[in-house]
Amino acid sequence: MKETTITKPLGTTVHLHRYRLRRLEPSQFFLFGAGLVVLFLTICAIAPQWVAPYAPTMIDPTNLLQPPSASHLFGTDYFGRDVFTLVVYGSRDSLLIGLASVVVGGVLGGVLGAISGYVGGLVDLIIMRFIEVLMTIPGILLALAIAAALGPSTLNIILAIASGTIPRYARVMRSSILTVKHRSYVLASRSIGSSEFRIFWRHVLPNSTAPFLVMATIGIGTSILTGSGLSFLGLGVIKEIPDWGTVLSQGRGYLTVAWWVCTFPGLAIALFVLSVNVIGDRIRDVLDPKKSNGSFTGGS
Amino acid sequence: MKIERSNKWINHTALSLMTAALLAGCGSNQVQSPNPSAPADQTAASAGNEQGGELTYALATSPDTLDAGASGFAVSHRVFRNIFDSLVFQAKEGTFQPWLASSWTKSEDGKEYTFKLRTDVTFQDGTPFNAAAVKANFDHIFAAGRGQSRSLLGTFSSAEVVDEHTIKIILSEPFEPLLAGLGSGFLGISSPKAFEQYGDQYGKHPVGTGPFKFVSWTENDQIVLEKNPDYKWGPPGADNKGPSQLDKITFKIIPEEATRIGSVQSGQVLVAETVPPQLITALNNDPNIAVDQSITNGTAFSLYINTKNEPWNEIKARQAVQLAVDVDTIVQTLYLGTYERAWSALTPGILGYDSSLENKVKPDIAKANQLLDELGWKQGGDGIREKDGQKLILRYLDGSPNREKRNDIAAIVQQQLKQIGVQVNLNITKDTNTPITNGEYDIFGNSQVKADPDILRNLLRSDKVFTKGGTNWSNVADPEIDELLDQGASESDPQKRKEIYAQIQQYMIDRAIILPIYVFPYTVAHSKKVEGLKFDLLGYPLLYDVTIRK
Amino acid sequence: MTGTIATRLLTSLLVVIGSSMLVFVIMFVLPGDPVLQMLDGNATTPEAIEQMRQQLGLDQPFYVQFMQYFLQLLQGDFGASRIDSTPVLPKILAHVPATLALTAVSAAVSVLVGTILGVLSAIHRNGIIDLTARFVGLFGISMPTFWTGILLLLLFSIHLGLFPIAGSDGWKTLVLPGITLGLVGAGFIVRMVRNTMLEVISEPFIVTLRSKGLTERVVMYKHALRNALIPALTMMGVMVGELLSGTVVVETVFARQGIGRILADAIMSKDMPVVQGVVFFTAIIYVLVNLLVDVSYSFVDPRIRRSQ
């Protein structure tokens, strides 16, 4: 049962790929599929009521743990709720957690990295030592500590996840800035007397964002995964309308008796993260085909 | 190697299965079978049992300490019941029988208990068991002072060594639950020499007089016990009196449910505790596995309404909640018929349980709405009631992780109360202590395990609020109830005690202070090779009589 | 070169000290009363709570606590757990081997699976093999680890009975957790190795080698792969942190011993000495691995060795 659901998307991919081989390169097809998934789930997150057939809070004791059928595409859970509806509504908080923690972590890390890289000297030394220290602390420690101390709320979960990602954004940003800083156009701009701020804002920053953007895109997926890990450890937010991570972790005890309860939310997470990764990969190739590994090797 | 063994085991069980099937006659699977191994089956099978073997027992959580006097957790009790014996033995019917104490007397005023101790008992480290040793245990409890032990001793004032094998316990006030406390594993007797030897590390090196000796404890992994070969003072409830049939018990700590239950299904452990309801049916269909359920006693899992916070200080508001929550639906939906619904604060197996409360409260949405209308809470635009610009909010506090599906109860209650215009704000968190200390909750769920109805004292007496060390979640402060609780503790006539506790239980329901939800059955899945697994009055497992069929 | 290593060791030491100081500050600043946490349902009187606070020195101001902690640390004294009063050092040392074994196996799985898939993917660029390899690689990083773990466990331990389910005795208990955690790293390495391979293949020296008449296999595996391994190695250094984080979840799913679980428990109960101790060790592991990675560059790529 599990096997079929997991291989299904792969199977379809292969099949379609053969069908369109002459027109579409495989990686483009990949990208196309990923785009569709992200688009669909974004629509779900913005307007779940358009997509979901039922109300997410509808508890129906007469309809517990029903396998997938025509009326319940993904079956029903242990409350008798429609699993498809849960997946659709769950996208809202999951995507929010993913995006917001990237924004928080990315802004903090990006600013630190940019300052460090551009100003250089003692400032760079201090910030980078700090980042290095931060990197030795397992991300989960910060996440656990913050989530446990601040208590469960979506905002706190976002902060918790974001905290662990600061160093990697800082390092990526710094290393890109370092490469761009000494490029001829920057030197040229300085020689004609542009202000430092203008140079940074107009020349350095725009040319350093590529690896950072790639990392941020992929970070959306990683954050969702970290969030579901927190749910698993009992630190997630339990709300009326749960996010995917919560549905997955609360439903995992039913795996052997009603596989559909958590398989579909699990697939939703996997598909979404997968798609985001595919898109991130693609952005990397398009923006910066030469330095495609810079984002991970960057740093001191 | 392990795989090989389990293969052999499958061959063996295939044979024994056929025998079992013949014995069982009709192969109907009952979901709720408190003790599926019928006595006839047991005697027939135990003929083929051999001495020895290792019992592996998967626990869901880890004990905090194995110092009986310092722990408050049920899981610790499950382990150290094998290491420690108690002065008295409480049978399933609630009566008391001699164990380490061969006899006892109670003074006229109920303030002095004199125990004659057995003279042939030694601790596992060779220290003789005597009155001084027992006294050392009380000293230890009042010096270290954590866990359940102190509250079980109630009004204990001092212990006096009368002679080598006689000890007198002196109470400041009569305290009827004393014997029940002394029968508990939390007041199991430790070796005084071990206290001295290990100091504050005693909890990792327990030494008692029980049928199993402590060998090792690897944190987050396992606790190993081995047979005490000199044991010959088995409790009255056991079939065995001498050394255990088992060579070794290994408690494995496996927190993840799927892993724990999977390990008993695949034969890697023999017993796994805390089987979730949805798996019971599946496991019952497994020919190699039996599921045992044992009702725990004490208080049922109930939702305690905080009567201190507005608007829930109003009895009508609480009654509206009481009438709107459909407990039958909750219990049916979540536990699929494997848990019994509760009607009172106390569990049915405890002295004084008031069965007249059964079926007394029935869901009635119309009445609930009417009560809220009477209080002036008007339906707002979004379906939530309002009064003076304030929304009708119930803050529901519950602990994480989702133990016994309690978080799911919260989710259903949230939906049910929405029907009467109450907005339930869930606060499901690891750290429940902080919101409780700050009074930031309107409803909180809890259950406790204890053998005596005096358990209600800690839940209801006005001085037992949380910040003063009690568990009066509802913040009940009623002099009459205080008076009744005191009477209940000091009254020695069981009939009168029953009446007192019936009054208290009725008070809790009539005033809508609590919503009793379910009675927790401690559920274990075990290989059918394991025989003689029993449970005590409180639902704790007794492993002394266990044998493993080869 | 020894001089460089000595400097690196020294800065590493400073980093480790810095990280435990930072954690001290973080844990101190975050709300939550450690004493209340310690009670864990065993309610006691306010007097007892106050007494406990004094015993632990928690009534002292921040700088006093910090200095005390720091001085103890310099003397190699990690203190004792506030929950069960076991000394921290032996407690952690008992759990370090299990976590190290898990991390090592996961890292090996990551590198092995990641490199194989990455190379295949680069050689068969844009073909069906490339597609599949990348898909598999991406899938590894797209599933929550607890979910992968439970699925593997149900399939291989319960249904097929190939591996023991729980525990930390013997190599067999390492297989499934190692794969679970290793797949995450593999996903990153696939991408890395593929991209570098593609870059290397287009470089002049490969063209030269080809034109010299070397077989494609020798060119690819002896020369191109060697160059492609460097980023994978660097990746390993960064990934150690991720892997150590991952152990928290994986150790719980597979009921393994390890510092991941110790850490999670300690954080949730605000057991500061234990948190500090674990962080100290993870920091050392992290720093050492990165040091090793740097040193091993020179073996993989002779150019780096010469430039030093």
Language-model regions: role of each:
Chain B
Residues 90-91, 226-230, 298-320, 324, ...:
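A bilobed periplasmic-binding-protein/Venus flytrap-type ligand-binding module shared by bacterial periplasmic
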Residues 23, 218, 222-223, 324-355, ...:
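Detector for C-terminal structural segments
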Residues 212, 306, 341-381, 400-406:
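Structural transition elements
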Residues 58-108, 139, 538:
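N-terminal lobe/hinge region of extracytoplasmic solute-binding protein
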Residues 378-450, 522:
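Ligand/substrate-recognition segments at binding pockets and active sites
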Residues 102-147, 162, 168, 311-313:
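Aromatic- and charge-enriched surface segment that lines or borders ligand/interaction sites
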Residues 151-194, 200-201, 211-218:
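Surface-exposed binding/hinge segments that line
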Residues 231-282, 410, 423:
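Ligand-site clamp/hinge motif
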